[in-house]
Amino acid sequence: MAQKGSERTIRKVVAENRKARFNYEIVDTYEAGLVLTGTEVKSLREGKANISESYATDEGGEIWLINSYLPEYLQANRFNHETRRRRKLLLSKREVNRLQGAVNREGMSLIPLKIYFNDRGRAKLELALGKGKKLHDKRETSKERDWNRQKNRLLKERG
């Protein structure tokens, strides 16, 4: 029997939206389950998914992932899935209400950050609540990143 204190969460990241942190100021993150078909899970396990152009929206008290790309599973004959279909996200009612309130009142966006398999083998989506950055904010972020690289380089040379 495993002890709870010694358990480590093992995440196998399948798809990551790397531009999201550059284009949005991330306020909060949530872990959501995905409603998938069998061929979609097998396709995800091959690791060729893409969520860089996807987004999440709330419709009828539910959160949906839109425009995510899961390629067809090659070994599935005619029972394959649609590559860019809408996928339902599994969140608690409290989380759904909180996300809907933030999107409707504060003008925030729901951004998918990454899809991964947790330690139990379930496909999960890391969903972020964020505000879009302006152009000057993006420039400031890149300047700060460049300065940190330069600073680390100088410290490495001297130290």
UniProtKB/Swiss-Prot annotation:
- Tell me, what's a Pfam family for it? SmpB
Q: Mark out the compositionally biased spans (Basic and acidic residues).
A: 137-159
Entry GO terms, CC: cytosol
**Cellular location of this protein?**
Cytoplasm
Q: What does this protein do?
A: Required for rescue of stalled ribosomes mediated by trans-translation. Binds to transfer-messenger RNA (tmRNA), required for stable association of tmRNA with ribosomes. tmRNA and SmpB together mimic tRNA shape, replacing the anticodon stem-loop with SmpB. tmRNA is encoded by the ssrA gene; the 2 termini fold to resemble tRNA(Ala) and it encodes a 'tag peptide', a short internal open reading frame. During trans-translation Ala-aminoacylated tmRNA acts like a tRNA, entering the A-site of stalled ribosomes, displacing the stalled mRNA.
Predominant location category: cytoplasm
The name under which this protein is listed is SsrA-binding protein
Which biological process terms from the Gene Ontology are attached to this UniProt entry? trans-translation
The record lists the organism as Sinorhizobium fredii (strain NBRC 101917 / NGR234)
Does the keyword section mention RNA-binding? yes
Q: Record's Gene3D superfamilies? A: 2.40.280.10
| Keyword terms of this UniProt record | Cytoplasm, RNA-binding
Has the keyword Cytoplasm been applied to this entry? yes
What PROSITE patterns does this protein map onto? Answer: SSRP (PS01317)
UniProt cross-references to PANTHER family, sorted A to Z: SSRA-BINDING PROTEIN, TMRNA-BINDING COMPONENT OF TRANS-TRANSLATION TAGGING COMPLEX
